[in-house]
Structures are given as structure tokens and as C-alpha cells.
């Protein structure tokens, strides 16, 4: 019985750690794009919340490859690997419009 409880606790901890990891990555976007990707009304920054994951990932790749004009996003995007971009894309898509 104890082992089953530990296994369940381990799964919950792993999910918790994964959730904290992605929320931490997403928090770095909040300064410009708003909390959870919800940019303020009238903001010049694009809203990330609800953005389709394929679009988000394509935009990040475009920044990484200097194919999209930007001021700081080239440097920011280059700080993420493909897995992190995939996780961020899924996170922001789940935030809904």
C-alpha cells in the first residue's frame, strides 16, 4: 500500500515540476506580452494567449533565424531550444483567447 502511495505522489510531483517549469518559462514573456500571454488592450505587443501552437513555433523559429524583424525577440528566441518552444506553444494555446 505504501509503495502505491509513493508512486502516485511521484507522478503528482513530476506533473507539478513540469507545470512549474513551463509556467516559469512563460513568465519571462509576461513583461511584454502580459500575464499568461494576455497583452493589455491596445498594446503593440501580440497576444500569445490562444495563439495556435504551430503559429507560435513558426514565429519563434523566424526570430531565431533572423527572418522576422524585431528589436529584442531575436536574442530572446535564441535562448530557447526546440522542446522549450514546443512546450511554450502548447502552454499559450491552452490559455485561450
Which residues make up each language-model segment?
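Gly/Gly-Pro-rich "capping" loops immediately C-terminal to redox-active cysteine motifs
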Residues: 19-22, 37-65, 74-78
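The canonical Cys-X-X-Cys-His
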Residues: 27-35, 88
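Detector for the c-type heme attachment site
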Residues: 33-38, 93-94
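C-terminal capping alpha-helices of c-type cytochrome domains
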Residues: 68, 77-97
Amino acid at each position: 500500500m505504501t509503495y502505491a502511495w509513493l508512486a502516485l505522489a511521484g507522478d503528482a510531483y513530476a506533473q507539478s515540476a513540469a507545470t512549474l517549469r513551463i509556467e516559469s518559462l512563460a513568465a519571462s514573456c509576461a513583461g511584454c506580452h502580459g500575464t499568461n500571454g494576455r497583452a493589455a488592450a491596445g498594446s503593440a505587443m501580440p497576444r500569445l494567449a490562444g495563439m495556435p501552437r504551430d503559429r507560435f513555433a513558426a514565429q519563434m523559429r523566424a526570430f531565431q533565424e533572423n527572418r522576422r524583424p524585431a528589436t529584442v525577440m531575436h536574442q530572446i528566441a535564441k535562448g530557447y531550444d526546440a522542446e522549450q518552444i514546443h512546450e511554450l506553444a502548447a502552454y499559450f494555446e491552452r490559455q485561450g483567447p
